[in-house]
């Protein structure tokens, strides 16, 4: 047994059903109604389409003329859905990029630092502590590539600024792509926007 799709007379997707593995194409769902004179009249209630629905269709519709699945959702509604989906994708990718890692040469050579939410809070609280206490002139900080390294107050301030620039640059990238998304007038234009 395999899955097929029941569609109405217009080809609109109604529900899935099971058919024999060897069944292909389109078959009609017929009911019979008694009519005058004892004759039965065949009434087509819908169709079973034993053709797989391609991925990416939001409202699959069977086109009886072309004998293939097409998008049944109006283009303007489809564009709205695609924009919402793309915006959610861009937000997720931006957050992942921000909370990933960044590089800094605050120590004179480049090192990789974590910037997840915990690291961001630790950066902020350490910076505030250094600003409030003049005797707090250095701190050890974990890098992703060289373990824990000592940072002077000046080096840590530079590191903090590099982290903030990492975040700011990614937010600016998100805003630029968000603006591009707002101005997109077709699904193809939306799909062409990449993080």
Predicted segment positions?
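A preference for well-ordered globular domain cores
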Residues: 1-195
């Amino acid at each position: 047994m395999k899955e097929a799709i029941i569609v109405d007379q217009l080809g609109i997707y109604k529900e899935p059903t099971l058919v024999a593995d060897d069944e292909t194409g389109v078959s009609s769902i017929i009911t019979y109604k008694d009519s005058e004179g004892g004759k039965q009249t065949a009434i087509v209630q819908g169709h079973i389409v034993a053709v797989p629905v391609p991925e990416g269709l939001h409202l699959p519709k069977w086109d009886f003329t072309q004998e293939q699945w097409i998008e049944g959702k109006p283009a303007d509604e489809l564009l709205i859905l695609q924009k919402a989906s793309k915006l959610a994708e861009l937000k997720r990718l931006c957050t992942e990029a921000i909370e990933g890692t960044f590089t800094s040469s605050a120590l004179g050579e480049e090192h990789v630092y974590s910037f997840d939410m915990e690291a961001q809070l630790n950066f902020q609280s350490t910076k505030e502590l250094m600003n409030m206490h003049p005797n707090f002139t250095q701190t050890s900080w974990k890098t992703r590539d060289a373990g824990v390294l000592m940072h002077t107050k000046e080096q840590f301030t530079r590191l903090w600024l590099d982290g903030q620039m990492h975040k700011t640059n990614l937010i600016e990238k998100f805003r630029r792509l968000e603006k591009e998304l707002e101005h997109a007038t077709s699904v193809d234009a939306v799909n062409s926007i990449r993080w």
